[in-house]
């Protein structure tokens, strides 16, 4: 399909705007990422998710051999996220597909599974016939 003059003009203007604002944006990002500094956490939270450093420090201490009760917390965390999933079919123990899988793919895999299941049942029925 041909590109319209309007879309070409819009693209050109966006590119010029990016060129104009690039130094300002770069300075803003540098000020946010500056470790020593003046950057406010609110600015950082606008751009990225902030992770608290405490769990990482505890992990480092455990590696050095100074663990004290952190094992209990790890067990609790495992309990929350422990999902047993079949690697071949991607189904979990409740028969649910992963959240990231789209509906078409789920439907296709289900149909494939049902088709395979139907073939095996038909063969068993045929073998039982007198």
Swiss-Prot record:
Q: Where is the signal peptide?
A: none
One of the GO BP terms on file: dendrite extension
Tissue expr = Widely expressed, with high levels in testis and spleen and low levels in heart. In the brain, expressed in the cortex and hippocampus, and at very low levels in the cerebellum.
Annotated segments matching region Disordered: 1-23, 57-76, 104-130
Instruction: Tell where it localizes.
Output: Nucleus, Nucleolus; Chromosome
Q: Which residues form a coiled coil?
A: 10-78
Principal cellular location given in the protein's record: nucleus
Q: Where is this cross-link: Glycyl lysine isopeptide (Lys-Gly) (interchain with G-Cter in SUMO2)?
A: 78
Q: Where is the composition biased (Basic residues)?
A: 1-21, 104-124
Q: Name one GO molecular function term.
A: basal RNA polymerase II transcription machinery binding
What conditions trigger expression of this protein? In the hippocampal neurons, down-regulated by sustained activity induced by increased extracellular potassium concentration for a prolonged time (2 - 5 hours) (at protein level).
Q: GO terms for CC?
A: chromosome; nucleolus
Q: Which UniProt keywords apply?
A: Chromosome, Coiled coil, Isopeptide bond, Nucleus, Ubl conjugation
What is the documented function of this protein? In hippocampal neurons, regulates dendritic and spine growth and synaptic transmission.
Similarity comment: Belongs to the learning-associated protein family.
| Subunit architecture | Interacts with CTCF, MYO1C and with the transcriptional machinery, including RNA polymerase II and TBP.
Q: What is the designated name of this protein?
A: Protein LLP homolog
Q: Which organism is it from?
A: Mus musculus
